[in-house]
């Protein structure tokens, strides 16, 4: 499989996953022009569009892409029905597109109907889990978002996180501010600074590594809890998540 990150807007990524026959899926096309250019350059043949949620920077290119490819199915959660989705999918559904199997995972939090698509090893998770961070809670509750990222964290170590924004460096700066002595975070921040200085993407990233440098996946870390002045029994780690999310919102 060939995975391509297509830059869009200021910091979005539209994902394209193609097989050897150059049949591909397009994930969260916020705009059509860069997608059409990539399709033409690589002679890819789109088989489906996958939408994770209803925000315009993820669905804005759907109408024009369907103008160019009238028969292409557009999969998405119920909240995208008025944003171009032609096939509504729900938690636990399975899709087979261009010989690749996809499992739908409900991940409410950023929006109430947000979903992710998992096709081993690829995880297209929209604005739920970012490298070294997570999405803002625009519609859902902290409990929902914490449960969602924990659900994604249970996927296999080799899972490749294909999120929709280049937020890695800013997320690492926040993580370093919380845990300044953490060498994994400090070293990775330096690596990403070099990468971004060359305008290269920081994504995708393996989940196994993400568990080390993403503070939102480390709410049970005693040292982290001490640093933010929050201690929680295992059944209320969401309070640690809430404190982290609140601090990140104002960082």
Swiss-Prot record:
Residue numbers binding Zn(2+) 2: 57-58, 127, 165
Enzyme Commission code(s) on record: 3.1.2.6
The keyword tRNA processing appears for this protein: no
InterPro entries, A to Z: Clx_II_MBL, Glyoxalase_II_hydrolase, HAGH_C, Hydroxyacylglutathione_Hdrlase, Metallo-B-lactamas, RibonucZ/Hydroxyglut_hydro
SMART domains: Lactamase_B
Disulfide bond entries: none
Name recorded for this polypeptide: Hydroxyacylglutathione hydrolase
Organism: Yersinia pestis
Top EC category: hydrolase
Residue numbers binding Zn(2+) 1: 53, 55, 110, 127
Molecular function as annotated in GO: hydroxyacylglutathione hydrolase activity; metal ion binding
Subunit and interaction comment: Monomer.
Gene: gloB
Gene3D superfamilies the record matches: Ribonuclease Z/Hydroxyacylglutathione hydrolase-like
Entry's family note: Belongs to the metallo-beta-lactamase superfamily. Glyoxalase II family.
Pathway: Secondary metabolite metabolism; methylglyoxal degradation; (R)-lactate from methylglyoxal: step 2/2
One Pfam family of this chain: HAGH_C
Transmembrane among keywords: no
């Amino acid at each position: 499989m060939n995975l391509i990150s297509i830059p869009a807007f200021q910091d979005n990524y539209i994902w394209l996953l193609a097989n050897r026959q150059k049949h591909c899926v397009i994930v969260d096309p916020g705009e059509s022009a860069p997608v059409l250019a990539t399709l033409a350059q690589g002679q890819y043949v789109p088989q489906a569009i996958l939408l994770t949620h209803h925000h315009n920077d993820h669905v804005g290119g759907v109408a024009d892409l369907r103008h160019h490819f009238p028969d292409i199915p557009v999969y998405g959660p119920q909240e995208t029905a008025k944003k171009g989705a032609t096939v509504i999918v729900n938690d636990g559904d399975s899709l087979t597109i261009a010989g690749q199997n996809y499992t739908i995972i409900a991940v409410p939090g950023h929006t109430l109907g947000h979903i992710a698509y998992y096709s081993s090893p690829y995880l297209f998770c929209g604005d739920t889990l970012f490298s070294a961070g997570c999405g803002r809670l625009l519609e859902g509750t902290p409990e929902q978002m914490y449960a969602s990222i924990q659900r994604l964290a249970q996927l296999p170590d080799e899972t490749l996180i294909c999120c929709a924004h280049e937020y890695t460096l800013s997320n690492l700066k926040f993580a370093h501010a919380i845990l300044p002595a953490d060498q994994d975070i400090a070293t990775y921040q330096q690596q990403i600074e070099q990468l971004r200085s060359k305008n290269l993407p920081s994504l995708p990233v393996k989940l196994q590594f993400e568990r080390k440098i993403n503070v939102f996946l480390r709410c049970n870390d005693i040292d982290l809890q001490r640093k933010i002045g929050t201690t929680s029994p295992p059944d209320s780690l969401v309070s640690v998540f809430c404190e982290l999310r609140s601090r990140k919102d104002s960082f």
